[in-house]
Amino acid sequence: MNGIITPQKQKQLMSSPSRDPLSTTELSTPTSQTTVDVNDTKKSEGLDSTIILLTPGTSPNATPGSSELGLSKKPNSIKNNTYSTAAQAAYLNRRAADQSTVMTTDPISYANNNINNGTLPQQNAYYANSYYPSYYAQSQAISNNRPGVSGFRPAFNSVAPCYGSQWQTHQSVHPYHVNNTHQYLKPYVQNVYPQMPSLNQPGLHIVNQPTYLAPVPSATVPTNSVSLSMPSFSQGQKNIPAAINQEMSVGTTKENTNYLSQLVGLHPAIPPAIPSMFPMSHDNKKSNMESTSRTRNVYIRGLPPNTSDENLLLYTNRFGKVSSSKAIIDMETNLCKGYGFACFEEEKSALICISAMTLCGYQCSFAKESFSARLQSLQDTESTNLYISNLPLHWNESDISTLFKPSKIISNRVLRDSKEQSRGVGFARMQDRKTAEDIINKFNNFVLDPALPPLQIRFADSTDQKKFKGQTQKRRLWRAREYSVLTKGMTANNAFSKVEEFANNSMPSKVGMYVPLESNTVYQHSPTYDTYGWQSMYPSYSVYPSNYENSRSTTPYHAHPATSAAN
């Protein structure tokens, strides 16, 4: 019975207040009307005093085509329909002028709250041209939006829209941080240099050379630094294995090899050596461990071209206190010639350096007698023949005799070229050794003409000295040519320009860059090795593993001491 509409109920419904289904405005009666007078100022714009009748229930949310769109007019307004249309146009113009060109609110919320369902036409929600949604946002069309343009609705309600340059500051487009704090992206290795640590930073093992302290990365970045208790050099290196600490001989046990491998793997890891075409044999390696003159100076051959004095100090000061070190640099190319020297304060530190560097493929030995000292030891102590250089080009034999008077000269000669032009060089044989020594003391560095260099007088080379000079010169030329061939691919593309200075750039050199540390190794290829194709020079087993039993047998110059002894 409740659903049956009786004439009485219908009468009550007609007399009760009615409600627009899409509006909150109540209508007192279906026929109630409100008059709105147009301002008299509009008359100057060509408008009459037309009265526009609007239904109070009309709302911007009324659907198109509803009965609320009808405008009730007074009888005299029917003939003034054109003026009513003009009034609507004026209203729209005022509304468009008040509309802000650039929205200050969220365009998504504006579009959701201002859908075009109103009675009067409205502008569509304005989307700034520089608005970019997040890359993970899902494109969803907003109903009755701008024709042909679909809106964007982020998948997460908490995401705020971005404008212009603000898009790049949004967290979703940030690059991945090495600490793995981003929740959407997968990690990747970032090609950066670690920060230079402070001098007193805890956890640093190499502290005996604070001036050239190597940078270490943060604990969150895996590197090739090895967690190893470095021996305290100030305490006499108590952690050195007995075979090295007591016998001072080549490490031939597994304990010694592992210990040396750990020293090699400390940051900065010592790079693989430039190989030699004619490496030393195992017998020569043993002889290189013997210091006949009890010297502490170590000769190291096989250094990469980018090795500087600072790099060499960083490589050698892990074995003990270094009193001096020098990498031999070519003055023309500013690159290392492939060898250098390191002088230690203690002989046992030099022994450890030779053993460890040999493990990396370097040719190391106690520095032999210098070239000048060796040459002097080969001279003839009974010779009276003098070698004279920087002679004036117009001088002849009589001029030399006149210069050395009253000393007696047995014979003299000025060297000339094929055109009989003087070379500025001559010889003079004196009467005895004492007279020759007096001539050297008196006329060596003697200035004949301020426009010419001073005279240089010394004893002429003996037969043994000439032979030694020839051998040394050939050896140096061969090694220089060999080293140039082996490093040609590295220097051709300027791969080894001048190494960055640690103090100026606060970053490690190319050799000291970081590479990920694998689980079962204590020594990794340096980035220099991987970048410049040194794999063609070394076999795959030239990386020295900590599990020594599983290492493969090697050729002599790659051999571990223990492997060579076993064979």
Swiss-Prot record:
Q: Where in the cell is it found?
A: Cytoplasm
Which GO BP annotation is one of this protein's? ascospore-type prospore-specific spindle pole body remodeling
This entry carries the following GO cellular component terms, namely:
cytoplasm; cytosol; nucleus; ribonucleoprotein complex
Ranges of biased composition (kind: Low complexity):
21-35
Q: Where is this region: Disordered?
A: 1-39, 52-76
Q: Which domain of life is it from?
A: Eukaryota
Return the SMART domains for the record: RRM
Q: Where is the composition biased (Polar residues)?
A: 1-18, 56-66
Q: What are the protein's UniProt keywords?
A: Cytoplasm, Meiosis, Repeat, RNA-binding, Sporulation
Give an example GO molecular function: poly(A) binding
Cite the Pfam families for this sequence.
RRM_1
Enumerate the spans annotated as RRM domain.
Answer: 296-380, 384-462
What is the documented function of this protein?
Answer: RNA-binding protein which plays a role in sporulation. Regulates the progression of meiosis I and may function in the vicinity of the Mei2 dot.
- What PANTHER family does the database record attribute to this sequence? RNA BINDING PROTEIN (PTHR24012)
Tell me the protein's name.
Answer: Sporulation-specific protein 5
